[in-house]
């Protein structure tokens, strides 16, 4: 499959005056890859209430209601691409990607901030902590998130003109 490779919220173009995404930008990362990686990363980024550089906040860091809303839109537009095996692993993929990114930020901090651009001291260390908190938030909510996902895909939906996957 062809994936975007960096589907974070900053790479989603939103229509002016509307609450609707119209395009993904920053296409230099388009490549063959796994749908779960792309969709998991998109959900990790878009459902993080604080963003990668966020400060302390109240409540769960991972927004379950955004997770459900984003997946409802995905289901209606391209849900046929997400097979049963993908759905079974989707929440786990979001959690795994948050942990992976936390490790990448932490490693970059230890290496002298060579990969991710920083504007202040210890910014990548802070970013790592945010991703690890996000990981913990997803873990605490894993069962309810899986229930939301199952409920969304149990409903009937309009047919998609997308190519079918073999899963």
Each model region followed by its residue ranges:
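Active-site acidic catalytic loop and adjacent metal/ATP-binding pocket
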Residues: 1-37, 50
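Secondary-structure capping and boundary motifs in well-ordered enzyme cores
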Residues: 4, 31, 94-99, 127
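Hydrophobic side chains within alpha-helical segments
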Residues: 8-11, 41, 103, 134
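Short amphipathic alpha-helical segments and their helix-coil junctions
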Residues: 20, 24, 71-84
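Loop/helix-junction capping segments adjacent to catalytic residues or to phosphate/diphosphate-binding pockets
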Residues: 33, 84, 100
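Active-site activation/catalytic loop segments of kinase-like enzymes and analogous catalytic loops
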Residues: 36-79, 96-115
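All-alpha amphipathic helical-bundle segments outside canonical DNA-binding/catalytic cores
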Residues: 82-94
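ATP/Mg2+ or Mg2+-diphosphate-binding catalytic cores
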Residues: 100-167
């Amino acid at each position: 499959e062809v994936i975007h490779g960096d589907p974070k919220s900053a790479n989603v173009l939103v229509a002016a005056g509307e609450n609707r995404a119209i395009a993904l930008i920053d296409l230099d990362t388009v490549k063959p890859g796994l749908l779960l990686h792309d969709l998991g990363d998109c959900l990790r980024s878009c459902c993080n209430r604080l963003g990668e550089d966020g400060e302390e906040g109240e409540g769960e860091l991972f927004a379950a209601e955004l997770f459900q809303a984003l997946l409802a839109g995905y289901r209606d537009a391209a849900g046929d691409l997400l097979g049963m095996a993908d759905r079974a692993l989707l929440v786990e993929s979001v959690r795994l990607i948050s942990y992976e990114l936390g490790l990448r930020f932490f490693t970059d901090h230890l290496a002298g901030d060579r990969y991710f651009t920083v504007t202040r001291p210890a910014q990548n260390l802070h970013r790592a902590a945010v991703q690890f908190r996000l990981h913990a938030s997803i873990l605490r909510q894993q069962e309810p998130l899986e229930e939301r996902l199952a409920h969304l895909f149990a409903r009937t939906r309009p047919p998609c003109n997308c190519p079918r996957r073999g899963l």
